[in-house]
Design a protein with these regions (language model features):
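Caspase-like cysteine protease fold
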Residues: 38-54, 133, 137, 164-178, ...
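Short, charged beta->alpha transition segments
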Residues: 2-3, 53-60, 131, 166-176, ...
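Non-catalytic, solvent-exposed interaction/assembly segments
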Residues: 1-37, 44, 58-63
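Short glycine-rich anion-binding loops that position phosphate/pyrophosphate groups of nucleotides
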Residues: 18-20, 147-151, 188-190
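A short, glycine/acidic-enriched catalytic loop
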Residues: 32-33, 148-178, 194-199
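A domain-level signal for caspase-like cysteine endopeptidase catalytic cores
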Residues: 57-165, 185
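Active-site-proximal C-terminal subdomain of hydrolase catalytic domains
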Residues: 178-251
Length: 251
């Protein structure tokens, strides 16, 4: 911490935790003592991320000078018979696409201003084959998924459209094959392991399955997330990426 302070940089803490019940804990909001501010919000800025050494070495990462994003809008409410109509989904997709594309046209904090090209392609409630085909035909470095998800064996389930799901293992295989470097899930429970009785199954969450298959970076939610929170997060996160912030700082 003293070295980071002396260099006027944030202190990065990368947690390697293998107990599935401990991984879920929000370490970022620990307090030095009762009634004090969370350590990640204090004067000395701390940046948290989870990591694991229990993976094969990554192949050389691609070097891109633009954000090439595939935005996927899945099903919001899997138990809803009526659901959201296609027009509403198109309007939501347009809003998200503008947020992401405009994130490149900003002035970085303390900088002279740099334009970062940002191309966003959108899929609305695709089938698994449509999703795979789009990933394979594009040159995407980032995948954004907005929709519903639940913990389940094989890396959880993403609800792509009514009656159609895709598990984390299937998605991991195509993401690694297409060399996607960052996968972001604005979906509930993406970092939550599946439970068998009272026991959490190790390495069973969507985030962990993708990491262990070789996706370099995954951002997923530990709990439920409201629609407005999801929109605000995407906007702030995309702007930070366009400023060339590291992922942990962008979060």
């Amino acid at each position: 911490q003293g070295i980071a302070t002396g260099q006027e940089q944030a202190l990065r803490l990368r947690l390697e935790i293998r107990d599935p019940d401990l991984i879920m804990l929000p370490w970022e909001i620990m307090q030095p003592q009762a009634g004090t501010q969370a350590i990640s919000l204090g004067h000395q800025k701390l940046l948290f991320s989870r990591t694991t050494s229990d993976v094969d070495p990554l192949s050389s990462l691609r070097t891109d000078h633009a954000l090439n994003i595939l935005l996927i809008l899945g099903q919001n409410e899997p138990n809803s018979r009526q659901g959201v109509n296609h027009l509403q989904l198109e309007q939501e997709a347009t809003t998200l696409r503008k947020l992401l594309e405009n994130s490149g046209q900003i002035t970085p904090s303390g900088g002279s201003g740099t334009f970062v090209p940002c191309q966003v392609d959108t899929l609305i409630q695709p089938t698994p084959s449509e999703l795979i085909s789009q990933l394979e035909s594009g040159n995407y470095n980032i995948l954004f998924y907005a929709g519903h998800g639940v913990p389940a064996p094989d890396g959880g389930l993403l609800f792509l459209r009514p009656g159609v799901t895709m598990n984390g293992t299937e998605l991991a295989q195509v993401l690694t094959r297409c060399r996607v470097t960052l996968a972001v899930f604005n979906a509930c429970w993406g970092a939550q392991p599946v439970r068998q009785g009272q026991t959490s199954v190790p390495r069973s969450s969507l985030a962990e399955v993708l990491i262990h298959h070789g996706v370099p970076a995954v951002l997923a939610m530990r709990d439920a997330i409201a629609d407005q929170e999801a929109l605000s997060f995407i906007e702030a996160f995309a702007r930070s990426l366009a400023e060339r912030m590291p992922i942990d700082q962008a979060v």
